[in-house]
């Protein structure tokens, strides 16, 4: 990929990524100035010939190529630094792992400011010389039409995309398409199974784990439903899972103060050893534009004095065969009635509720009560009504009563992140205050075996129960 980008007369294509040491970088002010004008007008004015060499004079692989904002699902977005080397490496590695050729056609419906679109998808297509079909915004009604019209073979999913598509009415042509490969994160085992049952078992689904700024990741290469990848040789990677006490909100350390590795099937936080070595791209942590935000993601003296590790904030578990499974985000587990509740487990259990487009689960504070009560924000499919009794029956049949959401919020115009997830941090702040939400609110009533509209009286009755 790097060589293809360098097909300009007079440019040495044999250079390594790190032609200059990190501390000796020529100024790239001239390059930045060139792109300070209207980028679209600049692109449309090109006639297909190579751009002038002086535009790239002084640019090295370690320089910043772009800033990608994190999704902001659980907090304010942060601008992650993406170097040219990281972007190129993403394309080269994914092309090999996904076995992409120039005959493939990618479908990009994600915003190009999102890491999945601007890095792994776009960089991979360019590395292989494959085509990309870009849609300005995801459309459930146009998705399969686009797939068939353009002969698309590969698309990337995030968030609730697969659930959105499954909620559309089934048709006789559901299996008549060219799509063969999909990659992304957040595909639950239930949705995964429903997807291949409805749209065909021809799919190679590359479920993975990682993040825009992460310096390590996993990817499922053999269709193990629900797994986000397999690590056969941990000692050959910079990834580790370390023990974490969710109740205390802290790491579990040994007698010397160092962290401990999680055992088989024991949830542990995923961390990546930071490798800042000239000539090595993998393992780098390029951080954010804010040094303070970057430092908060680093953990020092983890297994020995002086080592530095990037912290993900994600809990994973690894089974006896080396397969990794996403457990939860640290902080997404709340405590209610002296029990720990995983927001992900609750969301997965209720995710196939009839007519549901999207669900997010979170804990909200209740005056006079310790811990946080569960609340589910629901987005229903257009034209689908909310059946409170059916939702109560589903929740009680699949979850312990302490984990079944106490509150339900129905949202007509949800505030979604760029990767199609409900913005949880704002939902938590609003809680069950009708003055702030402006949405229909329900509270669980076990005596009536249903969810009833939230009032002061119905809330008091629910809390007594």
Positions of the model-derived regions?
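Conserved beta-loop-beta connector loops within the AMP-binding
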Residues: 240-275, 279-284, 384-388
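Conserved S/T- and glycine-rich ATP-binding loop of Class I adenylate-forming
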Residues: 64, 70-73, 106, 112, ...
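Structural core segment of the AMP-binding/adenylate-forming
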Residues: 1-44, 54, 170
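AMP-binding/adenylate-forming catalytic domain of the ANL superfamily
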Residues: 20, 399-422, 439-463
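Conserved AMP-binding/adenylation subdomain of ANL enzymes
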Residues: 88-105, 113-153, 168
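Gly/Ser/Thr-rich phosphate-binding loop
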Residues: 41-43, 127, 144, 149-157, ...
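AMP-binding/adenylate-forming catalytic core of the ANL superfamily
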Residues: 1, 155, 272, 276-403, ...
